[in-house]
Amino acid sequence: MPSSSALLCCLVFLAGVAASRDASTLSDSSCTQFPTSLPHMLRELRAAFSRVKTFFQMKDQLDSLLLTQSLLDDFKGYLGCQALSEMIQFYLEEVMPQAENHGPDIKEHVNSLGEKLKTLRLRLRRCHRFLPCENKSKAVEQVKRAFSKLQDRGVYKAMSEFDIFINYIETYVTTKMQK
């Protein structure tokens, strides 16, 4: 009987080692395939945003931009990683929860958009060369301050500019793939 327990224990251990190795290989292969899957992920983000774009852009009565050139400059520069990470977090934790409060249809589409953004963030984090961050972005802080000052209108402004954010993501990741 003790030998069958030892054998079972060894089999469980070997299965765990094999699963761990397969997961590592899967993660490595998903990182090598990330540059080719990125355009598809960005298309999905744009398609999900298109379902709420008109609603939020019609409600946005402000002429100023929330997502400015200084933010794009951070995305292109050495702060790109941090700017991207902070902006994803900003949209997921501050903007989208407020955006969901505009009816069940809007909530459903904003939820879908949020899930796609979470998937992108997860893929970026798995592939460390795309999201190895340390420093804070001043441009993101400016966006957050402007968003807060706008109060209720901030959600319309931030959501109406989500397509600009997708373009900034694309710029950041494209820059990283060229390095």
UniProtKB/Swiss-Prot annotation:
Subcellular location: Secreted
Signal peptide per UniProt: 1-19
Coiled coil start-end: none
UniProt entry tagged with the keyword Signal: yes
Biological-process GO terms, alphabetical: immune response; negative regulation of B cell proliferation; negative regulation of cytokine production involved in immune response; negative regulation of inflammatory response; negative regulation of interleukin-6 production; negative regulation of membrane protein ectodomain proteolysis; positive regulation of B cell apoptotic process; positive regulation of cytokine production
Keywords: Cytokine, Disulfide bond, Glycoprotein, Secreted, Signal
Disulfide bond annotation, renumbered to this chain: C31-C127, C81-C133
Its job: Major immune regulatory cytokine that acts on many cells of the immune system where it has profound anti-inflammatory functions, limiting excessive tissue disruption caused by inflammation. Mechanistically, IL10 binds to its heterotetrameric receptor comprising IL10RA and IL10RB leading to JAK1 and STAT2-mediated phosphorylation of STAT3. In turn, STAT3 translocates to the nucleus where it drives expression of anti-inflammatory mediators.
PANTHER family assigned to the protein according to its UniProt record, in alphabetical order: INTERLEUKIN-10, INTERLEUKIN-19-RELATED
Protein name (record): Interleukin-10
Protein's organism: Bubalus carabanensis (Swamp type water buffalo)
Primary gene name: IL10
